[in-house]
């Protein structure tokens, strides 16, 4: 949600800012803007509702000189999407400009106080309150911009990542963070600021990740300085980010989502590389090896996640309970943190997040740590907030995921959970050697299996045309594939805007069957497992009521094939890995239906890639 970019150095700032904003478009936004200090010291703010391309058109003919600037893509929280509410925001005197991600919870109190001191406001945002508070402190207290930011943020309740520049100062950006991501790229005599380091990766691979409660003083003529709100010196810890520009491009595909679907054979290879021996099938996860005692002593494992990551966690529940015989609970992070959960020191809390910045999941991590639990993270983005806040963890290593609808991150998360279950199960002695080797071997073979499944692309594209104008879908699955049904339904609703719901197949008769008619398609996952015959019976019930059935079946299936109107035939792997195999054709089905409907597949309406506000 929202994106921040900043630059100070020897280059022209505007091209750097605009390129960075384009790289952040995947996060979801409704308006964009830039602020720059020109060579004459003038502070210029340009912003508009719409896409970054609309901003570029708006900037034609404007004064864009200067080597310092900040830029922003906004996802509306306070105030409707329009030009006035877009960022950056001027202070009332237009001497200071600010960009801000997050939510200021006590903005109303602060705004009332400023209005009593004569301030008026152009917008209805909480962010404009913050920039005017900084200006008020600066002018009444005769302090520096840094001191004004420090004093202002001591009064703020809420989350923020912000950057501030001021008229006449061509050398310095003040930036701060609390519960919202911020990274600073370090170059030769120049600095790059971003809410996602990947947006400026072409300029540097050296990054400092700002921690909660820290303020960065970014001056082109001085080393980077980190201080706290109380003016204690912070640590400048430079991390190397290994990423190539090609990972951020479409590579000839029409959409990032399609590219990321087709990358999955490779991303599974990257996910398991060095973690499973092709000779002995031994699974080694350093996060388990280094914390063996914690896993052996665990009374319970609790997953906390949101969205697609929550669906992956449901599969993780099956994996760990079946293989490790440890009780597992799966919680929505947004609910977990507010219901006073019972967490003990012998619990393990596993936080799952692609970005590692999901606000509710990060808050759940902090709650679990305060309760004394051991917290393990499963993330994609190296150096992310959750990766740094957890006691240990495992990266999924699937590379940048730009499409808002998650695809390769989901299969990567499930792959890591399978390896985690095997590693812990062997340590506990709860998995047979035969099954251990079967699953480990299956993981090594997954890339080839997914290449095979992706060969269904043309078949699924043709099938999608039949259902483009459906208004509702039901997805059914059982066991390991109930979460897969949930995920398939989520993919469809996210990018096509068709209402879709996932159910355990047996639960259909407890309500959802009332919806079945010839205008309600059902996607039924009926691959071989111990519930196959039951699922086949559920499909017959749908058929008897005139429902259209798309069945995901094994290639050698002869039973369900006769009941379904259409089939998607997939290769069979060991039971616990079937969700990875089945999810790929469901991703393709959602993709092609959305394309047929002319949807913006990579940036669906109202959605953001990384939900960094509560």
Give short role names for the model-derived ranges:
Residues 1-250, 254, 266-299, 338, ...:
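Conserved short alpha-helical segments that host acidic/polar catalytic motifs at enzyme active sites
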Residues 4, 98, 164, 175, ...:
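Structural beta-sheet core signal
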Residues 67, 71-84, 279-292, 316-352, ...:
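Glycine-rich oxoanion-binding loops at beta->alpha junctions
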Residues 183-208, 334-368, 507-543, 573-587, ...:
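Glycine-rich, anion-gripping cofactor-binding loops and their flanking helix/strand elements
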Residues 257, 548, 561-563, 573-614:
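Generic C-terminus detector
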Residues 264-268, 272-302, 371, 392-521, ...:
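Active-site phosphate/pyrophosphate-binding segments
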Residues 296-445, 525-568, 589:
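Glycine-rich phosphate-binding loops that contact phosphosugars or nucleotide phosphates
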